[in-house]
Amino acid sequence: MPGLWRQRLPSAWALLLLPFLPLLMPAAPAAHRGSYKPVIVVHGLFDSSYSFRHLLDYINETHTGTVVTVLDLFDGRESLRPLWEQVQGFREAVVPIMEKAPEGVHLICYSQGGLVCRALLSVMDNHNVDSFISLSSPQMGQYGDTDYLKWLFPTSMRSNLYRVCYSPWGQEFSICNYWHDPHHDDLYLNASSFLALINGERDHPNATAWRKNFLRVGRLVLIGGPDDGVITPWQSSFFGFYDANETVLEMEEQPVYLRDSFGLKTLLARGAIVRCPMAGISHTTWHSNRTLYDTCIEPWLS
């Protein structure tokens, strides 16, 4: 009997320890695949999906398993096509992605792409965007000489470009769709076929529906900085812009905010606007700067 007891003792102890085995064993690494919302990336002017290879690497490193789609549409010179045409093309591309992601998606939209994405959020009545990350985008328009403009309109300067952009011919170019001359506000309001509409600055029959759609977004993350060198004024990335004297008025001083014409004031009131300014970054390096990614983008990719 004593020998039999000694033989059975380990088995008895094993039975007693079974409930505690999970505590005694090392924890397995958490499985990330499938736990993060898909990310959709929209490029900017004269850009392509290749420009975002660093950003793609950063996301894969920090949020392993995230499905990231860098949309390869309207690349290079095709990015000059009218923005409403681009909105339609990108809409057809994002709908299937959203339909496969019932928990929602994130949008990272760079430069001109930020305006495309804001229009998408306005016209899509069933979008499920959680974080809309606007990366150095001229959200309140552009009023500055850049190499792009000098190449496209070599005989025009900033002060007289309105003559081109506020014509039916000019509105066929994406850049002119958000050209915002503070010295010719009436012409801008009457001629702008894109920015004045998504801003709710000009009455149109879809204004109420677009505002409701835009407010479906979970969070609006605004990124930009004083050393951008292209977005003019750089505060346009944060919905600031020039007045008639070229003094920058911040977002809270803008008529579109005060009237809450497309939902900015409502978003801010519910704590859904994140502003992340960062100095020392030029326009073409926003999407490859690791510090910027860690500080301003990664925290919002849940």
UniProtKB/Swiss-Prot annotation:
The reactions it catalyses are: hexadecanoyl-CoA + H2O = hexadecanoate + CoA + H(+); S-hexadecanoyl-N-acetylcysteamine + H2O = N-acetylcysteamine + hexadecanoate + H(+)
Q: Where in the cell is it found?
A: Lysosome
Under Enzyme Commission nomenclature, its number is 3.1.2.2
Q: Name one GO molecular function term.
A: fatty acyl-CoA hydrolase activity
Q: Which residues are glycosylated?
A: 60, 190, 206, 245, 289
Q: Which residues cross the membrane?
A: none
| Keyword Glycoprotein applies | yes
InterPro entries found in the cross-reference section: AB_hydrolase_fold (IPR029058), Palm_thioest (IPR002472)
Using the record, list the residue span of the signal peptide; answer none if the entry has no such feature. 1-27
Disulfide linkages recorded for this protein, renumbered to the chain, are 109-117, 165-176, 276-296
- Active site annotation, chain numbering: 111, 228, 283
Chief location: other
Q: What is this protein called?
A: Lysosomal thioesterase PPT2
Instruction: Please report the organism this UniProt entry assigns to the protein.
Output: Mus musculus (Mouse)
Please state the gene responsible for encoding this protein. Ppt2
